């Protein structure tokens, strides 16, 4: 634990604001967007040739051009720029991008314009002395790029290619935002993130073709070693995501336990996996994927064994259906509080959706060897590509249909304390104290009553209150005046497409806090609550502010402290109105 805190604090180094020349190596496949190309990189030297600590990872953002689009994993670059510490925009309920980069060990970011960088050489062009971990990671990602090229050569394209790459290799950069929202809305985002479920399909294949034929002791040892190598090779190929590393560690411990006649699939092996992972990379402690993976596995290990002796488990088909539902329910039960707290949404249909698409996901993963063999040999490429595309279409169509069901997406506003309370109740419920049926029922009824009371208190504390929100949006300056969840006003300088530009705030803040969309005001406006004239806004509860967008207020000296509480200087303003507000500087707050 203390190593995690130390590693987190170690990322808070201060970068110099001066422009310098740096050498860096790209650590992942560059992500191409409409205007920029982004990539994770590791610094290897400064402008004076001095060595830079190898944990000095950066996020590089290139201005998009034909040269930037050719960048690959392992390329070594020299660039000039100002490295700054990642910061969020400060908008309410926004995605914590700074924390996301910090969890990946990235302590700085830099924008690199055209002709401000030069590629020295690629990964294969020169022998370099990198650490073993970095070298293996780059090689694994290069192999993954080659496999993706094989996928493309078979004729896979579009949404089918993006889904197949995500399910088999963990490459999610090609997935559209619409498809990601569908998987997240139905509660099956774990299907797109490589985890124990995907590795479980691979393990089932290994058991069928390798371990079932290893009867003698030395053959079992050889088979276990071969299976472990294949599992870890696949994990490295996928980029070592925390959820997949956890599954690979537990499977390795399970194989080791089977050789000595002991079960390696237990809470003890789960705890050992967590300790080993945090020793390797303490920053995984803050990764939400790491947290959800271990919570889901803890729920499966503690809840599922209690239902193995039920009478209905005697029939094979019923047992398969019941066990699949039980595993999904146990995993969802222990992850819902954290998902609701971190993401503000959860789905009632997550367990059912997982049960429906699991067979399709299994067929897609089992199709990976076939599509590779077809792409390499050139035999049956059309048939394989058509079959993979058809399976992917069926899976996506099933989830799109579920997305239309009532209460498919439930928006929540859980506080940290309510989330902790939910986990306290769950942990006590699975303790030996509640093993007997009577105690479990008694504690269950009591915990339901107390949880409902805690939920009511949570809603009271999280209820929206009158406030003014100044959104940090460079292309759409906006001020949100909120009176209640039913009544609010959005003042903006943009005449067109205000809702489209504010869509990410709408999804994260408005749908979570407001029961009705705000009234968009782009000009003069007046009603019983608020009025606006040339950017000067005044309303009930003493609300008053001025949005400076042009020079219409220049030369006016009547801006006394009693008239305006906030002065919002919008981007592009070049007037002289600020010269006449010095007498109100004690009470007026300036926002730019």
Write out the residue ranges for each language-model feature:
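Membrane-interface amphipathic/re-entrant loop segments adjacent to transmembrane helices
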Residues: 119-138, 185, 340-356, 366-423
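Hydrophobic alpha-helical transmembrane segments in multi-pass membrane proteins
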Residues: 110, 171, 175-351, 412-463
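Hydrophobic alpha-helical transmembrane segments in integral membrane proteins
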Residues: 2-19, 438-444, 451-477
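Core dinuclear metal-dependent hydrolase active-site scaffold
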Residues: 283-286, 403-417, 421-423, 432, ...
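Conserved small/polar residues in nucleotide/adenosyl-binding loops
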Residues: 580-587
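Divalent metal-coordination and catalytic microenvironments
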Residues: 81, 167, 195, 239, ...
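Membrane-interface helix/helix-cap signal primarily in integral membrane proteins
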Residues: 2-190, 522-526, 557
